[in-house]
Swiss-Prot record:
Positions carrying 4-carboxyglutamate: E50
Residues making up the propeptide: 25-45
Protein name as catalogued: Alpha-conotoxin-like Ms20.4
Highest taxon in the source lineage: Eukaryota
Modified residues (4-hydroxyproline): P56
Tissue: Expressed by the venom duct.
Disulfide bond residue pairs: C64-C73, C69-C81, C74-C91, C79-C93
Subunit structure: Hetero-, homo- or pseudo-homodimer (identical sequence, different post-translational modifications). Heterodimer of [carboxy'Glu-48', hydroxy'Pro-54']Ms20.1 and [carboxyGlu-50, hydroxyPro-56]Ms20.4 may exist.
GO function term, MF aspect, one: acetylcholine receptor inhibitor activity
Function: Alpha-conotoxins act on postsynaptic membranes, they bind to the nicotinic acetylcholine receptors (nAChR) and thus inhibit them. Through its two C-terminal domains, this homodimeric protein would bind to two nAChR allosteric sites, located outside the nAChR C-loop of the principal binding face and at the adjacent binding interface in a clockwise direction. This toxin specifically blocks mammalian neuronal nAChR of the alpha-7/CHRNA7, alpha-3-beta-2/CHRNA3-CHRNB2 and alpha-4-beta-2/CHRNA4-CHRNB2 subtypes.
Phylogenetic lineage: Eukaryota, Metazoa, Spiralia, Lophotrochozoa, Mollusca
One GO term describing the cellular component: host cell postsynaptic membrane
Cell compartment(s), UniProt: Secreted
Keyword Disulfide bond assigned: yes
Amino acid sequence: MPKLAVVLLVLLILPLSYFDVAGGQAAEGDRRGNGLARYPQRGGRDNEAECQINTPGSSWGKCCMTRMCGTMCCARSGCTCVYHWRRGHGCSCPG
């Protein structure tokens, strides 16, 4: 197999590393960035979401309405966040 074909095959398979080998599901984002939305940290919203504060003392943060995993949001709230050596964080979802 020519080297270019091997490189293209590797680049095609590389995104699959975001999936859990045991049948997990990829972390779901907003297709525009890291999957995190900006929500006010006040009111009832901060009780429902897992958030990362942008800056200390700020009323804005990056939040997930399901489960935050690294810098991404999992697809459903029942997912667990797992860390794969050399691949980073990913969501493992039941079913």
